[in-house]
Amino acid sequence: MFGISSGQIFLCFHIAAVTVCAIRVLYRQRNTGTAFAWLMVLFVFPLFGVAAYLLVGEARLGMARAKRVEQMNAFYRQFAERHFQHEDLDTDNKMRRRYQGIANVAASVTGLAASNNNAMQLLTQTDEILEAMLADIQSARQTCALAFYIIEPQGRIQTLLAAVRDAAQRGVECTILADAVGSRAFFGSEWEDNLKAAGVRIVPALPVGVLKTFFSRSDLRNHRKILIVDNLVAYTGSFNLIDPRHFKQDAGVGEWVDMMMRCHGTAVLEMAAVFYADVAVEADEHLAEVRQEIEKLDDKIPELLALKRQSGTAVAQVIPSAPDQSDPVIYETIVCAIHAAKTRVTITTPYFVPDELLLTALTTAAKRGVDVVLILPEKVDSFLVRWASRAYYPKLLAAGVKIALFHGGLLHAKTLVVDGDYALFGTVNMDMRSFFLNLEISLAIYDRDTTKQICNLQRDYLKNSSYIAIKSWQQRSKLR
């Protein structure tokens, strides 16, 4: 009727779609390189680019979930303001001034400040990790909360799951939050059925499906590892619920090498807040259940905090990150910590694929005289990550960064130590997925005594590693 062909209508819609996507790229993409790449794809391959951006261009977790997350964050901020007294959070006399700003960066996003009454025990061997966790679960009287990316019910993990089952049968309130993709071997197994039959609440984190793909991204995962018993003791670190003697034995990388921190103090309540918020967002549509549970604790909180003030003197801060946060808080914390370094930065990570900002932080630190050491596994279980990591070696080595390859298995521990008096560890790999896409958790340590434990662990890793010589690596690259 208007003399407009169907082709012209399609062209107009297509131009509009590309324009809208391009505007969203400019406003929503945090990383400049990523934004530029998306713009190139949109304008060079417009049809494919629009479809791809709608599917994976943004870290979408769904509108309903995003609303619940916002409500839970507001609720926990009020909870912290009501219960955490100034004396618990007064760290000025115990924290070096140059780290106070770094702590504020995280607190401004998460609402969780550093606390000064924590006790930390570093566990570095699978046997001692499992034995400690098992003992705490067996002694649980009120609650037992587990959140893990991978739960693989084989070997010694079956003993731990049996302890959770037994705890539920004697009246302990037990909840397991497991990533729907990472723990696919657990879901649908006999262990899931047995635990449910015993009264354990099992919640899949970020479930996937064809229809869900249109509303949220299926590649966003809950990568956190947390165990909390009676709100008095908590664990976090790199350890999944896997038995290294059975897990990925055909990958050719050796057994996974992990660490966990066993914690007492205010940090335990902060980890509990993260856990129950995750459960509520996944399983409590109107957030009524979790509010009721936390309100039940109101009378108990003063007693719990009184116990926690007697726990220890370590200054620690729980830092959770998620793609729906206003800023990539753990990523920003890492970059700030590296820039604050004066003498030494030591990092262990299984997967190292930095962006330009992190790469620049490492290379400029080395150039200004900081001893920068990366401890990476000699072999990893991802072909693409292995070659992507190696692409950065020449620039790092040329700047003076030392790269040590660990020979004792797949080094899965994620640690960062600055100048021997600041440490960051937890679930975060040094790659873009951990920084911008996954739900992660880290623990920042601001005192020398606790940090020394992690320094000693890093030294042990170095004893089983060999440094890459820049000349031999350059020659190797030329030959290839």
Q: Where are the predicted features?
A:
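Active-site-proximal loop->helix
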Residues: 386-387
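N-terminal localization/anchoring segments of enzymes in phospholipid and broader phosphate metabolism
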Residues: 1-332, 336, 340, 364, ...
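Active-site donor-binding acidic/aromatic loop of nucleotide-activated sugar
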Residues: 403-407
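Helical hairpin unit composed of two closely spaced alpha helices linked by a short loop
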Residues: 341, 351-373, 377, 382
